């Protein structure tokens, strides 16, 4: 854990880790790679890992798939059938499978970094990456809506059908703020805040264990065992949340695309 690697406090008092501990040191000394952090390196490595895995899985396809081919096909089928087909449906879903597939596994791998010893840093615990992904999705579904419905899409997205005319002055501003302001912000912050909060809890638990073990009191040393048990439970819960957040982000993307494609029926 990063938390267990934090230096002990000289004051003898417990000082919980903060946001600063979420920033890993630069890759090269003396500012030689300023602006290129370890988080960026992890992002690039995630692309390599994903590409290598699926290239190897699809390289020698057989009628009776081996373990690697089966894993690749199952992963692809999960996104294709479980998200794209179920949410978007019709004949439109297939063209959006590459986007949803890339989003899911890109987020998944970068989240799983937080569960790997000695790395333990989910990339999206930094808000910048979450903003970029949410921004890509935001402009994508708007472009899809305009392509399908023309500029009339903005009317379809902000003026609900069947609403009495005298309520529209209240409803339209709410729809504009909800669809074009709140939606992209919550899409990014949901991923970022969950990863940040979960990782901070694990870091605090790790620092607490270190602090208790270093105390002279036998009672406090024994308490560290309980904290360790809680930390392991939180670690497992965080690992589950890492997978769920990749799924939720991709699922919401599919919902937004479906809404843009069928704006005239909402």
Swiss-Prot record:
A Pfam family annotated for this UniProt entry: ATP-synt_A
Compartments, as annotated in UniProt: Cell membrane
Membrane topology, from the record: Multi-pass membrane protein
GO cellular component, one term: plasma membrane
Source superkingdom: Bacteria
Alphabetical UniProt keywords: ATP synthesis, Cell membrane, CF(0), Hydrogen ion transport, Ion transport, Membrane, Transmembrane, Transmembrane helix, Transport
Keyword presence, Cell membrane: yes
InterPro entries in alphabetical order: ATP_synth_F0_asu, ATP_synth_F0_asu_bact/mt, F0_ATP_A_sf
Membrane-spanning residues: 38-58, 99-119, 126-146, 162-182, 191-211, 224-244
GO molecular function: proton-transporting ATP synthase activity, rotational mechanism
Keyword Nucleus carried by entry: no
Chief subcellular location: membrane
PANTHER family registered for this protein in UniProt: ATP SYNTHASE SUBUNIT A (PTHR11410:SF0)
Subunit architecture: F-type ATPases have 2 components, CF(1) - the catalytic core - and CF(0) - the membrane proton channel. CF(1) has five subunits: alpha(3), beta(3), gamma(1), delta(1), epsilon(1). CF(0) has three main subunits: a(1), b(2) and c(9-12). The alpha and beta chains form an alternating ring which encloses part of the gamma chain. CF(1) is attached to CF(0) by a central stalk formed by the gamma and epsilon chains, while a peripheral stalk is formed by the delta and b chains.
Function according to Swiss-Prot or TrEMBL: Key component of the proton channel; it plays a direct role in the translocation of protons across the membrane.
Family under the similarity heading: Belongs to the ATPase A chain family.
HAMAP family: ATP_synth_a_bact
Protein name per UniProt: ATP synthase subunit a
